[in-house]
């Protein structure tokens, strides 16, 4: 018997079965001890659900390093009829993962896109000020936001929203910047972060709390396949063309830099792979003025 036929058949069977799995309502898993007196990580999520998809590194920071993780709901989606429900789903998803949640406005920010930015709309400037205030108040050690070609207009808009908000910080403000990808793949990621089966399963479970979204499109079932494709891409994009691929099954790709002195600065020489066997805290062990090494 051809084993590859069985392999593909099992994948197809699991996806079909997964469509009947419960959505949300799962008991909260054990929580790690959190170091409340240290700067947090902030995830600037363009939409409710992004925190569950690109949050592999953030989840490891919380579970391995005891870091507070705050998910900032940049928008609550474009469908006004769903914004209240999406916030409720987001609260449940964040609670399941152990992330804190911060709203930007009663129903989230609106028109977060490059057109609003180019038009110089007052609403855009007001949105930038909201994000700038969040950065100044929380003084995060790490922030997550999409890269500048992440295809979706709100994802790209969120990138520039953060760029503009960072530019409004005081000269001494510094933090690590982790650019994320989902809709559009990064051409130059420099960080490949492995996720365990447990972490990925918990992220999928949290994603299932976004009931209204996954009912219309069960994309939560395809996150493992996306993470497997990240292993394929990351093996060469991060590890180097023709290099040996890391022994990962699931991973997420990021671009890690540092905001310091009013600008983004490269801190990795080449790329870095972070397996589950290495504590994620080592990734940010360098002092603010020190360039991280592989």
Where are these regions (language model features)?
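Active-site beta-strand->loop->alpha-helix modules in alpha/beta enzyme cores, enriched
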Residues: 1-173, 185-186, 205-209, 261, ...
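Sparse, context-dependent recognition of short Cys/His-centered cofactor- or disulfide-binding micro-motifs
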Residues: 26, 128, 143, 178-180, ...
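Flexible domain-boundary/linker segments
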Residues: 58, 107, 160, 179, ...
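A conserved mid-domain beta-alpha-beta active-site/ligand-binding segment of alpha/beta enzyme cores
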Residues: 184, 189-252
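Acidic, Ser/Thr-rich low-complexity intrinsically disordered segments
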Residues: 245-268
């Amino acid at each position: 018997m051809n084993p590859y036929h069985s392999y593909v058949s099992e994948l197809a069977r699991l996806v079909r079965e997964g469509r009947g799995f419960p959505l949300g309502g799962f008991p909260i898993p054990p929580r790690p001890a959190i170091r409340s007196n240290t700067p947090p990580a902030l995830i600037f999520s363009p939409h409710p659900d992004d925190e569950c998809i690109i949050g592999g590194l953030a989840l490891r920071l919380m579970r391995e390093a005891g870091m507070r993780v705050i998910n900032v709901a940049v928008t609550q989606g474009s469908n006004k009829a769903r914004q209240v429900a999406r916030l409720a789903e987001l609260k449940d998803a964040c609670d399941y993962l152990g992330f804190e949640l911060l709203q930007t406005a009663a129903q989230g920010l609106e028109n977060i896109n490059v057109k609003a930015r180019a038009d110089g709309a007052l609403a855009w400037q007001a949105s930038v000020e909201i994000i700038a205030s969040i950065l100044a108040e929380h003084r995060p050690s790490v922030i997550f936001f999409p890269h500048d070609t992440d295809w979706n207009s709100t994802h790209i808009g969120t990138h520039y929203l953060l760029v503009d908000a960072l530019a409004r910080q005081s000269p001494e403000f510094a933090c690590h910047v982790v650019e994320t990808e989902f809709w559009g793949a990064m051409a130059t990621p420099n960080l490949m972060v492995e996720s365990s089966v447990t972490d990925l399963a918990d992220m999928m479970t949290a994603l299932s709390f976004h009931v209204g979204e996954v009912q219309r499109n069960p994309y939560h079932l395809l996150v493992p396949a996306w993470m497997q494709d990240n292993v394929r891409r990351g093996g060469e994009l991060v590890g180097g063309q023709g290099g040996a691929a890391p022994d990962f099954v699931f991973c997420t790709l990021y671009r890690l830099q540092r905001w310091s002195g009013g600008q983004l600065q490269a801190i990795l020489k080449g790329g870095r792979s972070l397996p589950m066997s290495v504590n994620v805290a080592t990734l940010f062990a360098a002092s603010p003025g020190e360039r991280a090494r592989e």
